Curated annotation (Swiss-Prot):
Superkingdom classification of source: Eukaryota
Membrane topology recorded in Swiss-Prot or TrEMBL: Single-pass type I membrane protein
Pfam family, one: Ig_3
The protein's name in its UniProt record: Tyrosine-protein kinase Mer
Residues the entry annotates as binding ATP: L593, G594, E595, G596, E597, F598, G599, S600, V601, K615
Signal peptide: 1-20
Result, substituting A708S: In a head & Neck squamous cell carcinoma sample; somatic mutation
Amino acid sequence: MGPAPLPLLLGLFLPALWRRAITEAREEAKPYPLFPGPFPGSLQTDHTPLLSLPHASGYQPALMFSPTQPGRPHTGNVAIPQVTSVESKPLPPLAFKHTVGHIILSEHKGVKFNCSISVPNIYQDTTISWWKDGKELLGAHHAITQFYPDDEVTAIIASFSITSVQRSDNGSYICKMKINNEEIVSDPIYIEVQGLPHFTKQPESMNVTRNTAFNLTCQAVGPPEPVNIFWVQNSSRVNEQPEKSPSVLTVPGLTEMAVFSCEAHNDKGLTVSKGVQINIKAIPSPPTEVSIRNSTAHSILISWVPGFDGYSPFRNCSIQVKEADPLSNGSVMIFNTSALPHLYQIKQLQALANYSIGVSCMNEIGWSAVSPWILASTTEGAPSVAPLNVTVFLNESSDNVDIRWMKPPTKQQDGELVGYRISHVWQSAGISKELLEEVGQNGSRARISVQVHNATCTVRIAAVTRGGVGPFSDPVKIFIPAHGWVDYAPSSTPAPGNADPVLIIFGCFCGFILIGLILYISLAIRKRVQETKFGNAFTEEDSELVVNYIAKKSFCRRAIELTLHSLGVSEELQNKLEDVVIDRNLLILGKILGEGEFGSVMEGNLKQEDGTSLKVAVKTMKLDNSSQREIEEFLSEAACMKDFSHPNVIRLLGVCIEMSSQGIPKPMVILPFMKYGDLHTYLLYSRLETGPKHIPLQTLLKFMVDIALGMEYLSNRNFLHRDLAARNCMLRDDMTVCVADFGLSKKIYSGDYYRQGRIAKMPVKWIAIESLADRVYTSKSDVWAFGVTMWEIATRGMTPYPGVQNHEMYDYLLHGHRLKQPEDCLDELYEIMYSCWRTDPLDRPTFSVLRLQLEKLLESLPDVRNQADVIYVNTQLLESSEGLAQGSTLAPLDLNIDPDSIIASCTPRAAISVVTAEVHDSKPHEGRYILNGGSEEWEDLTSAPSAAVTAEKNSVLPGERLVRNGVSWSHSSMLPLGSSLPDELLFADDSSEGSEVLM
């Protein structure tokens, strides 16, 4: 018959067979009709759909239905619609068919899976949506929904395919359908993508000190797990046995440069990290190309090119200057300056002199050699002094005025004299006339003609060089009479002469007698005033003296000393505070700014010497529950601040003593008033207050630089703060940060450490690991606390180590745990933070190094001019803001940000009938699907700001749980989700940032 009849027979018999199979399946499945065939449970299907439509529209069922009756039972992913037909038969519950549960495949492979459900024909416009990890997948074109209608039910199959899976495709996928306001959810399908190890943290290049230990970290993840790490140094393996990821390599020290890398192995193969170079810090090379940029009579401007920095940033440079004259004493003048901008103007030089100049720069290791010496000369200048001993004579016979003088000292001529300029002014009968005369360089006298008789002549003389005219001498006046003549006028600077010694001795004797007489009279008057305080002592000689009242002499100390002594503090502390005690009458107290368990801070006004009033902050103590030791510590903090003078360290204005109502003296410390309060509260308000304020990253870095400057100043003065935190840093009116609260600070007089000898309340989460163990404090302990403070600033006021109790901190740090990198924190900034938390205090940088690193990072960032330059976007993290003051204000920031550019509307859209998911397209920006937030309480912040606040309190933020470096994270915690501490560290606490324990 040939091949032609075969398709004809198939076309005749297959539809009949198919209808018969459907009828039999329906009869067997009653009263629960199911979709006939193997489609629902298969991972891939090859069946040709009878109907493939976006949605089954236009199909009119013959059955009547009503909504779900209240009180009818239904569970989980099952919807039980109540349908009434002509025969009033109830419909069975609806549910998705069981499908494959777990799919494991390699990276870059393709995968396809589906879910299916049989729905009565009475339900029209039913759609199936795909969800991944609680987020709806929108706009994906590889999701296809197929419909297979029958007489009573329609089988719906939704398939989802990914052409080339990636690690980000890991997750749980489900199907959702809504029927009669009931949501039906399918069983989850778990996709696990396996491949070569993926590095989440690779070793970083470092510059280390010679023979100083340092650590390198390498971390990689699968799946499959486990991932083992091998370390390689200069192409040779360091460890023969692998270490499980993450791995920390401790290098005891190097004497020469080395290259390190790490290898990550799992069952799929091996991945090699980038090679990093570890450089050894060395003394820098001397500067080169020292040149003269400009030269004047008393200054020289030089420039230079810095040499190799020895893998350590330059700190400062020294300019050495010595006179090139062989007759000079050979002394060297040294001028210190910052390393940048490689320019320096040398001042206070002599005019018309030759100098040899050399430059040397230093880094952390030491000073470089001096650059090659260069020769420089200053130019000629005008004389710096006037001629000396100017005298004027009148020669009536020749009708002339003779003038004599002495030339200025040679060193003060500032050049070669070319002559003198004489100014003579003639004044007579209200008429004034000034004339100028020029005299040659060899002259020391001059003669001028009399211009007017019966007049006054005023003469001044100035020396002249090629550099200009020097200052004029003091005026010398002589009167020219009409008849007769004056032959001499006193000089402006008379020459020293001999005086009669008898006259000198007599004058001194008379002076001593006069001084003694004045003292005697003043004492006598004072005594009389005291004796007559209670009566009249000046009676008549013949009167009878009945009672003589004499004022009792008091030998008490001054009131200030007595008040300080009554506090019971040590004599040493009294002497320190004596010169800063302020009269209580000069201070007016105002409202309370803050109050705690042991004291309060009040607003005040301090009267100044010029009559003005200064707004101040006054710290007081509650004497009811304060011991004598706490009072002395309170005043010791004031004594500590007395000698500080730095723009980034709060200064002491004074100490005031006030008698309380119980008659007990109460100390008060007077400090500058800070408009914006402490830094921690300011950061919290910027993030949690209604209508959060945006603080650019550049401003946060400026806060860190200010604190580093203040701590550098304290460290150089051998002071340990021991309580550095954001809450103890204050904000001035110009947004400058000041280090404050020196209640725990200590002065180091010998050595470089301080051992705490008694139990005290300490801020545990800011204390370095060695201080927790041994109660030993150094400046490097303050560096640790500075790193935690930087973390507070970067997170805008979050509490460090959330979920870790105070008594767990030492074990937590001992196991190598540290604060994690905050969201939106630059890698360079986190590296600076992390360097502050090195276990060995010697490995931590100094405050000078930290300041230079932060300034360099701040300079590398662009200036904040518009929203396009903003690096940080406020994500409005969820954190309780209870207890914050109402109506508080923040400092205005010179930045205008369009809310539309910060966050887009997250309002879920209406249900759509076609479910698609665009996955891994070949175009660069269309290769991933879009995740919907899935929260109905979010509103567009631009149109409803109040709704955004509601959403912040009641809904899960989009992206609140995210994946960073292969580990799930949460905004509410800086610890990885799912990670656990050691066995003894399994409990979280609800302590605040001020948590303290007894040490």
